[in-house]
Regions:
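Amphipathic alpha-helical "coupling" segments that flank catalytic cores
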Residues: 1-214
């Protein structure tokens, strides 16, 4: 395993299923790559200095999922990717983003953008596949994914158009995404935002005012 570069693992993602209707992890990775390019303006990435490393981080983000170490211990996902990226000679900003993509609140701007791209693809795709959380059932951890969209935006005080981001994500899904589904995803994320704001001590009327402006 160690002799291979991170990029060399990527094609093997075709053998790893993300979800039956949504294809393999390679399909998801390809979608994320296209989505990332569309979302660059929303992330404020307008120059080669940010667009290029962000694209590279998205391209390599999931490659470590097929390494032996991650296969044997899934909690190492991202961590192993970062190590492989550094050993493969990737830029440190790329490796850092790969390493923190699964954290609720990544610290680097490229890490945040990578995490949001991944989580939006999962939320929109899985909602469209009829796999939205119900009651206590949330097999794809979509509540955590939604909090993972909200928390970085709040923590880094980012001005990010969620509605537009969801619309761009919907265009790239391999199955149809209805307007109703898009609205449900937005409502679901806003619901998590409401929870997070209240946990931070914001009064109900303040939360309503913030969400009213969103």
């Amino acid at each position: 395993d160690v002799k291979k570069s991170l990029e060399e693992f990527r094609p093997e993602l075709s053998g790893l299923t993300f979800q039956t209707k949504l294809g393999s992890m390679l399909s998801k990775s390809d979608r994320m790559l296209k989505l990332g390019a569309e979302l660059c303006p929303l992330f404020g990435f307008t120059t080669t200095e940010t667009i290029k490393p962000f694209g590279r981080a998205v391209y390599l983000a999931k490659a470590d999922l097929v390494t032996q170490m991650v296969t044997e211990m899934t909690s190492l996902q991202g961590i192993i990717g970062r190590e492989y990226a550094l050993r493969s000679g990737e830029d440190e900003v790329v490796a850092t983003a790969i390493g923190e993509q699964y954290k609720t609140i990544p610290q680097s701007e490229i890490g945040v953008a990578l995490a949001l791209t991944d989580r939006l693809d999962s939320l929109v795709g899985l909602f469209s596949a009829g796999l939205a959380p119900t009651g206590t059932k949330d097999p794809f951890a979509l509540r955590r994914a939604a909090i993972g969209v909200v928390q970085p935006l709040l923590e880094h005080d980012l001005d990010f158009d969620l509605n537009e981001a969801i619309a761009e994500t919907a265009k790239l899904q391999p199955i149809e995404v209805s307007d109703g589904t898009r609205a449900k995803v937005l409502e679901f994320i806003e619901g998590r935002l409401r929870v997070v704001l209240r946990e931070r001590g914001n009064a109900h009327d303040v939360v309503d005012a913030i969400l009213g402006q969103a």
